[in-house]
From Swiss-Prot:
GO terms for biological process: mRNA splicing, via spliceosome. Coiled coil: none annotated. It is found in: Nucleus. Residues 32-123 form the Ubiquitin-like domain. Its main location: nucleus. Keywords: mRNA processing, mRNA splicing, Nucleus, Spliceosome. The keyword Nucleus applies. InterPro entries: SNRNP25 (IPR039690), SNRNP25_ubiquitin (IPR040610), Ubiquitin-like_domsf (IPR029071). It comes from Bos taurus (Bovine). This is U11/U12 small nuclear ribonucleoprotein 25 kDa protein. Component of the U11/U12 snRNPs that are part of the U12-type spliceosome. SUPFAM superfamilies: Ubiquitin-like. GO terms for cellular component: U12-type spliceosomal complex.
Amino acid sequence: MVVQDPLLCDLPIQVTLEEVNSQIALEYGQAMTVRVCKMDGEVMPVVVVQNATVLDLKKAIQRYVQLRQEREGGIQHISWSYVWRTYHLTSAGEKLTEDRKKLRDYGIRNRDEVSFIKKLRQK
């Protein structure tokens, strides 16, 4: 049934309810896709609500990676506290440093790109 639906046909076979709801929210304009670029060039399309904060984006990235690892059979642990302690998310050269600040306040819109950049050590 999901495979034949034109709105949901892009979803993977082992789809979760969360992914279905995100896709529907995208279609109704209640959510946006943020393209997260990893340092190896891989782009992860992450869905967040329109008024999402930086923290919401970080949680969505974690969920996206977790689901992808489960589907591909890779059961490797990622220390997200290490990731967020070591890397900044950036958009158009601006670091997304405040977790409570809305993505909209950083100028991030639907289909905009966000990338990881290594934090500089402070002495």
